[in-house]
Amino acid sequence: MSLREILLVRRLRERDEKAFKELIATHGDQIYNLLYRMIGNQEEAKDLAQEVFITVFKSIDQFRGDSKLSTWLYRVAANHCKNRIKYLARRHDRSTTELDDAAERHAAGQGASPIGAGHIEGPDRVLEGVELERTVQAAIAELEEDHRLVVVLRDIEELSYEEICEITGLPEGTVKSRLHRARSALKEKLEKSQR
């Protein structure tokens, strides 16, 4: 942990409101993006992000400092997300069709900024980038929850295997195996969509 993180954690433990605001300013977008990509609904992701930060603020004393603060935040967010997905599944008797609907909502532009679209020039190329992002996000939304989590953490959030292991509590071999299966499933889904 960096000195800055150590001081921030100390201030959070002292229940310093400015430290809480700093925590949200520093990590809010990352946590929201993770939650949004896992759930596929902006409002749910916003609500869940608030719950995550409230939980973190209330339970900061449980943070041992063995890992980076951001890694612990991701773990709390991932756990909240899994619980919310289970709750929504029970509440709505969620089906594959509803996951498709979530992917379509995201594809309709209700999501985070486009992956890679900022690197493409020209209107026709921008449209291609947006379409590609929609296709990829729809395919990610169709993945099993555990596979979706490792893909989002590794390929979108660009976390190391070590950080993903700390967040998920899984051994590195399991993370790599799930990531391989998830990427294979994504490749298959993307190839089908190109036909």
What are these model-derived regions, one by one?
Residues N33, D47-I54, S67-N79:
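Structural recognition of an alpha-helix C-terminal capping motif at a helix-to-coil junction
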Residues I24-G28, Y32, Q42-S59, E157:
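Conserved RNAP core-binding helix
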Residues A102-A141:
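Acidic, proline/glycine-rich intrinsically disordered inter-domain spacer in sigma factors
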Residues Q62-R64, A78-T96, E104-A108:
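Arg/Lys-rich amphipathic alpha helix in sigma70-family domain 2
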Residues M1-Q30, R37, G116, D124-R125, ...:
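N-terminal module of bacterial RNA polymerase sigma factors
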Residues R13-E14, G40, F53-K68, Y87-L88:
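Sigma70-family region 2
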Residues R64, I85-A89, L143, R148, ...:
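Short, Lys/Arg-enriched C-terminal cap helix and immediately downstream tail that follows
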Residues R4, R134-T174:
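Helix-turn-helix DNA-binding module
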